[in-house]
């Protein structure tokens, strides 16, 4: 089962950064990268064609389909449709939404936030102008985040590099995401008890069965599974996910400022060449990358090669 998308070169660069944690060292001729996830393999070519294969190909392709031309090839006539499982009128429900940032960035944390937006707060949240949180500037998010924090029940899991690096050898990136989402959701449920939300919406990064398998494997307790929905582009289906996305992003930005201050230099976001150069500089200065970066990224080896 597979699908091929045609994307622009700028979009291809974004995808390369996003999949950097999953990249393998060997790629076929003409390929920019090959990323192996638990349920899918993504192969991107210099031509802008990106091949998604495996049982989770739909979920992975859905992340990028809005910014791609029509698929050039599809198997089993499967169409990737974000939100296909979301009930009618879901946007008007009382929902806890969760989202994460930082998984594709070498420096900085993996940050996950969950926010409860009740029916009574929907109009207030709409007035903040966060419906399409992905288009907001960092400055605008910084303005909005304090209002969300003050009014809406929320919880943020900010997995700093040292903790991330301690956990990562025993948990793949998606498993760390699942653990963080589940913990954040549990904390918000505790805060709003005895109120129960109509639903929980997780911005999807894995198939539902895979997500719950991750939590079982990690022996998480309790596992939040009642009325849980998954979809990519979750912010388009409920404002709670948009609010969570903003909180996660602002906490990530604040953490990057703090880490940059400790490093004595600006730590770039992403996983490109600029990141390699800064990591190499940190090594030359005798600073510990474990404190600043996700060490399993290919950037670590690249930085060391620049030093040697």
Swiss-Prot record:
GO cellular component: cytoplasm; ribonuclease H2 complex
SUPFAM superfamilies referenced in this protein's UniProt entry, alphabetically: Ribonuclease H-like (SSF53098)
GO annotation terms (biological process): DNA replication, removal of RNA primer; mismatch repair
Catalysed reactions, semicolon-separated: Endonucleolytic cleavage to 5'-phosphomonoester
EC numbers, comma separated: 3.1.26.4
Keyword Ribonucleoprotein: no
Principal location class: cytoplasm
Name of the protein: Ribonuclease HIII
Taxonomic lineage: Bacteria, Bacillati, Bacillota, Bacilli, Lactobacillales
């Amino acid at each position: 089962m597979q699908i091929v998308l045609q994307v622009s070169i700028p979009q291809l660069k974004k995808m390369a950064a996003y999949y950097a944690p999953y990249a393998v060292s060997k790629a076929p001729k003409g390929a920019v990268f090959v990323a192996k996830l638990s349920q899918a393999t993504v192969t991107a070519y210099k031509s802008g064609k990106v091949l998604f294969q495996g049982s989770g190909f739909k979920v992975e392709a859905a992340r990028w389909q809005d910014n791609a031309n029509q698929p050039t090839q599809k198997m089993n006539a499967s169409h990737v449709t974000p939100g296909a499982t979301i009930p009618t009128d879901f946007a008007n429900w009382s929902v806890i939404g969760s989202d994460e940032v930082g998984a594709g960035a070498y420096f900085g944390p993996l940050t996950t936030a969950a926010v409860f937006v009740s029916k009574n707060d929907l109009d207030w949240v709409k007035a903040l102008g966060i419906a399409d949180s992905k288009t907001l500037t960092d400055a605008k998010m910084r303005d909005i985040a304090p209002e969300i924090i003050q009014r809406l029940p929320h919880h943020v899991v900010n997995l700093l590099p040292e903790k991330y690096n301690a956990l990562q050898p025993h948990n793949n990136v998606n498993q760390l995401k699942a653990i963080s989402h589940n913990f954040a959701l549990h904390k918000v449920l505790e805060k709003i008890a005895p109120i129960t939300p109509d639903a929980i919406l997780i911005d999807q990064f894995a198939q539902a069965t895979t997500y719950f398998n991750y939590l079982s494997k990690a022996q998480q307790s309790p596992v939040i599974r009642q009325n849980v929905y998954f979809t990519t582009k979750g912010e388009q289906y409920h404002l709670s996910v948009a609010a969570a996305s903003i909180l996660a992003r602002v906490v990530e930005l604040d953490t990057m400022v703090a880490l940059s201050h400790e490093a004595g230099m600006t730590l770039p976001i992403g996983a490109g060449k600029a990141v390699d150069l800064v990591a190499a500089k940190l090594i030359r200065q005798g600073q510990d990358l474990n404190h600043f970066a996700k060490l399993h990224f290919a950037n670590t080896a690249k930085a060391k090669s620049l030093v040697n």
